[in-house]
Regions:
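Residues on the lipid-exposed face of transmembrane beta-strands in outer-membrane beta-barrel proteins
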Residues: 44-48, 76-82, 95-97, 125-129, ...
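Outer-membrane beta-barrel "beta-signal"
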Residues: 21, 28, 152-188, 308-320
């Protein structure tokens, strides 16, 4: 998970920098296979401007659902671009590593699925029209390369917005050194299979703020049941925070998840197995008042035994 550690460093640096923006793009994807399967594509990006002509971005990319593949991933790209005007066009090219998650099949049927992970490259070209405000319109052509199953090409369009600076006093109200936070959470968990089975998930989270940009958490989590199978455990994560508005904080976490997992979906008395897996999360927290917080997180559990899952949790908690 070298990429995720590099993103931690990137976001730590960006928390004290100025020109940053977020974007949401959507469009079409074509898999570079003989069948030429097509599907949708979505990109959520966060960009840090390093220089007049250079930027670096962190991207979540969903490559859609071509036949026998549900693939998404995380990419980091270094961009070279023309000067960015207050209003008008800029053009750029980006390249970097891409860590993918692919729900695929071992025998050519939807009943047998596998969760494959690995490294590839992500490369992009874009054209951006900067509006008079902080908003902009973007068209992007992206290509994933070096992945065993297939490469893919995506054409997407969407909007972006430059993030303004938040005064330090406001940042400290959202998260200050020594703060403690207890959250009660509930939501849905989704098995990364072709059926995408869902169940009700719950969590109890404790957080400790080390700096206004770094937190640590321990989460007791129950991912619920799929038929007779059930998984629950405890995760510990380190979080990086970036103020988005005066009351809202964006966050990214990475850590380990120790769990007890029952894999047999037909026998409720089947033996449970113990596993430890990486877990990566992104989220947003809202400061309701001096003590109460609301939070939404999405976590990806990354296993080595074909049992990846997405866990979405929404809740509220008390800061003290």
């Amino acid at each position: 998970m070298r990429y995720l550690y590099s993103i931690f460093t990137f976001l730590t640096i960006s928390s004290i920098a100025h020109a940053q923006d977020a974007s949401l793009l959507a469009g079409a994807m074509r898999a570079d296979t003989d069948a030429g399967n097509t599907s949708f594509a979505v990109n959520v990006g966060y960009t840090q401007h390093l220089h007049k002509y250079f930027s670096v971005s962190a991207d979540y990319l969903n490559e859609g659902h071509p036949k026998f593949h549900h693939r998404d991933g995380l990419g980091a790209q270094l961009w070279a671009h023309t000067a960015i005007p207050e209003r008008g066009w800029s053009f750029g090219a980006g390249f970097g590593p891409y860590y993918y998650f692919d729900t695929t099949t071992g025998n050519g049927s939807f009943g047998d699925y596998r969760n494959e992970h690995g490294w590839g490259q992500l490369m992009s070209l874009n054209a951006i029209y900067h509006l008079h405000s902080r908003a902009y319109v973007e068209a992007r052509l992206s290509h994933t390369h070096g992945i065993t199953s297939h490469d893919s090409t995506m054409l997407m369009v969407g909007m972006g917005y430059e993030l303004g600076s938040v005064p330090r006093a406001i940042r400290l109200e959202n998260a200050d050194r020594g703060d403690n936070l207890v959250m009660l959470l509930a939501g849905r968990s989704i098995v990364n299979s072709f059926k995408s089975e869902t169940s009700t998930s719950t969590g109890l989270e404790y957080r400790r703020t080390f700096t206004p940009n770094i937190e640590g958490s321990v989460i007791l989590m129950n991912e619920g049941k799929v038929d007779a199978a059930e998984r629950k455990g405890v995760s510990a994560q380190v979080w990086l925070l970036r103020p988005f508005t005066e009351r809202t904080v964006l966050e990214m976490g990475f850590g380990a998840y120790a769990m007890r997992d029952q894999l047999d979906r037909t026998d409720p008395h089947a033996e449970r197995e113990s596993h430890v897996a990486p877990i990566a999360s992104i989220g947003m927290r809202y400061r309701i008042d001096d003590h109460w917080r609301a939070q939404l997180t999405w976590s990806r559990v990354i296993t080595n035994y074909e049992r990846d899952s997405d866990v979405f949790l929404l809740g509220a908690g008390y800061a003290f």
